UniProtKB/Swiss-Prot annotation:
The gene is obg. PANTHER family: DEVELOPMENTALLY REGULATED GTP-BINDING PROTEIN-RELATED, MITOCHONDRIAL RIBOSOME-ASSOCIATED GTPASE 2. Gene3D superfamilies: GTP1/OBG domain (2.70.210.12), P-loop containing nucleotide triphosphate hydrolases (3.40.50.300). This is GTPase Obg. SUPFAM superfamilies: Obg GTP-binding protein N-terminal domain, P-loop containing nucleoside triphosphate hydrolases. Its cofactor is Mg(2+). InterPro entries: G_OBG (IPR031167), GTP-bd (IPR006073), GTP-bd_Obg/CgtA (IPR014100), GTP1_OBG_dom (IPR006169), GTP1_OBG_dom_sf (IPR036726), OBG_GTPase (IPR045086), P-loop_NTPase (IPR027417). It is an enzyme of class 3 (hydrolase).
Length: 337
């Protein structure tokens, strides 16, 4: 399935129906009064966040969306039928942005959130509404109001428990494929992953959602490589799993390349809890691995893990699961001052 995380849409709510100017016409009723009905309200366009969706693919060929207009009122005080609302489902984590002002209208970051982006026009008034003691037979009615219209941008920022980060070709896709049911493409060349992939890893009796973020290169914060197309997805991850190719000549430089790009893009990203793993350890001798591991651990002043292609992933997944659960517990503390 294609992954689409940004689309531009033109939205037009339905116009209100016109009011009606009519009079009662019956046998033996010489002076029937006004009985024109009101116009129906135009349809709204409403967005709802759906936890079962993970891409904006539904909008690929649907860039102009218009709700139906209300029907005009008729005689016998019958109001016109209201226009039908349009309900649009988007993935959780979708931001709705005004294209002109670039203002975030709403951030649908929780399941089942509902937001009306454009409102349908009010229906016009029939001539019954203008009857008075001085005007017993009004012929005046009003037209329906036009529905709101707006150009918007939908931007999806993937919601996941763990985000796998690192330079291109460090084994991120392979890790996700091994620990989940993801069908991520794997290859021995840079930018095998050109869009975020999501996978669900089972850890004992629970599950965690893991996102494979495309490789980060120097100047990614300026848009180099795949740039902003994927850096934004890291903002919603609870934990970062930083994979580094152990065969890299300069381990610290390899770490800093990714770390610095995150900091330059959004300084808050480097405040996220990070687990650092040296990957592809089956390609080097144990003594060389230990030397690089200790060198990086001393530089970071924290533990660095090692991973080979044949290693059991459950220990790392359990560690990630524990960290994720801690984040969930600490999301909101109403008693914390």
């Amino acid at each position: 399935m294609d992954f689409i995380d940004e689309v531009k849409l033109y939205l037009k709510a339905g116009d209100g129906g016109d009011g009606c100017a009519s009079f009662r016409r019956e046998k033996f009723v010489e002076f029937g009064g006004p009985n024109g009905g009101n116009g129906g309200k135009g349809g709204d366009i409403i967005f709802i966040s759906d936890a079962n969706l993970n891409t904006l693919l539904n909008f690929r060929c649907r860039r102009h969306i218009k709700a139906s207009s209300g029907k005009s009122g008729t005689s016998r005080d019958r109001s016109g039928t209201a226009g039908k609302d349009i309900i649009l489902k988007v993935p959780v984590g979708t931001q709705i942005i005004d294209e002109e002002s670039e203002e975030v209208i709403v951030d649908l970051d929780k399941p089942d959130m509902e937001f009306q982006v454009v409102q349908g026009g009010k229906g016009g008034l029939g001539n019954t509404n203008f009857k008075s003691s001085t005007n017993r037979a009004p012929r005046h009615f009003t037209h329906g109001q036009p529905g709101e219209e707006r150009n918007i941008v939908l931007k999806l920022k993937v919601l996941s428990d763990v985000g796998i980060i690192g330079m291109p070709n460090v084994g991120k896709s392979k890790f996700l494929t091994r620990c989940s049911n993801s069908d991520t493409k794997v290859g021995d060349y840079e930018f095998t992953t050109i869009r975020p992939h999501l996978g669900v890893a089972k850890v004992d009796y629970s599950e965690i959602v893991i996102a494979d973020i495309p490789g980060i290169i120097a100047d990614a914060h300026l848009g180099v490589g795949l740039g902003h197309k994927f850096l934004k997805h890291i903002e919603r991850c609870k934990i970062l799993l930083h994979l580094i190719d152990v065969t890299h000549d300069e381990i610290i430089s390899a770490y800093n390349c990714t770390h610095n790009e995150l900091k330059l893009y959004n300084s808050d990203l480097v405040e996220k809890e990070e687990i650092v793993v040296l990957n592809k350890c089956d390609l080097l001798e144990e003594t060389e691995i230990l030397e690089k591991k200790n060198h990086l651990a001393n530089y970071l002043d924290r533990e660095v893990l090692c991973l080979s292609i044949d290693d059991d992933l459950q220990p790392i997944l359990r560690l990630l699961n524990e960290k994720v659960k801690t984040k969930e517990i600490n999301v909101y503390d109403p008693f914390k001052m």
